[in-house]
Amino acid sequence: MENDYNIPSQTRIGHVHLKVSDLECSLAFYCELLGFEITTLFGNQAAFISAGGYHHHIGLNTWHSKGLPPAAENSVGLYHTAILYPTRKDLAKIFVRLNEANYPLTGASDHLVSEALYLNDPDGNGLELYWDRPKEFWNYTPDGSLIMATNELDIKSLLEEIE
């Protein structure tokens, strides 16, 4: 097939909808720990949650997954959902919140263009919590490719944002 179509540049991903095994447990994680707000509840089967009043950034449902175990790690499916924080200070605050709750991280990386925390929700769905460095600090190769890496995140430096 010839590719003569480009998706409009203003297109954005509006939301992600996750299958979960226990709606209450997922709402506790996303709302009580991460700070999202419930915008719509669909009985005890599903919910829409949001940051900042949007109708929903994340949908959670148990329609085909109630009480089931997480998908196998070595299987096809969604790798992670990335949640963009507006500032480095905001990323530091959620790091402290996760740490105080003893919630385990699966990683913490400096990608040169961004800094990121990685974790799994209660159903094993991967999450990346990150902030982007300003674009004027991004570097490119001579051919125009963005230079990125997966370096260890300097947690001490991150925490200095809120001291």
Task: Give a label for each model feature.
Residues 1-7, 12-21, 69-163:
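Vicinal oxygen chelate
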Residues 2-5, 66-71:
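Short beta-strand/turn micro-motifs at beta-sheet edges
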Residues 8-10, 18-63:
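Core segments of cupin and vicinal oxygen chelate
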Residues 15, 55-58, 80, 111:
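Histidine-centered active-site/metal-ligand motif
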